[in-house]
Amino acid sequence: MFGVVESMKKETDDKNYKKRFVKGLKLLCGSKSTYQVWSDCIALFAITLANQSILPMTKFEQFKEVWDKREKEYLRIINNYSKKEQKLFPQMFALIVEELEERPNQDLLGELYMMLQISNDNAGQFFTPYVVCEMMSKLTLDRKELGKTVHRKGYANVYDCACGAGATLISESEQCKEMFKKYNYQNHVYFVGQDIDITCVHMCYIQLSLHGLAGYVIHDNSLIKPEPKLPEDIEKIWFTPMWFTDVWTMRRFFHSQDVLGR
């Protein structure tokens, strides 16, 4: 395994980040299923981003409790792997970041999930191809109404009740980027996803965070709770780093979270 870790370091000139990520993932599948390793990998990435994001909020007891629980979950997962295997995870996370930096307009994690052929292992999930999400966003996003909402309130939100890995939200954000060419859309539109599958929540959260989008992803059943309101149990909510920037913090100061979450 150590030799493999070294070989991955030597592949830094190889721009095929997806291939290198899949290679690293499969190296961890000795005694574990591909789905288990994928879920662990994604959970570690999500917790790393989330706990860093809410760290300034840990002065409040409810956020401190969530931070502690996620930190314990991180340690529980990572301790299932050897010291040598643990060295692969930050390298794989870096590959995800590099891929999205070069080609942001894609559903990277959803594509990898389907590429690894692990969807059938988890309730037969199938993620809509990103090109289809792009077409749907272009056809359904009411730019005029969105513009009016932003002009009237200063912000608008986009909600996906079954977000999967976040393809629809990402494609909607690309439409917003084209629409608000005179403004930074990241300061005027926030994105909310919801899914019953925690691995999907993690995937969507990672991608929204790395795309620099303000918002959050809720781990809950959309059939029972279809409205995108912030639940009282904040452990179910995964806030993106942009959600805590000064712009959105001030908006929450002037508008209650209950109103902002509608």
Residue ranges of model-derived segments:
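Class I S-adenosyl-L-methionine
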Residues: 2-180
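Generic alpha-helical secondary structure signal
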Residues: 21, 25, 78, 117, ...
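Conserved S-adenosyl-L-methionine
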Residues: 132-238
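SAM/dcSAM-binding transferase cores
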Residues: 229-262
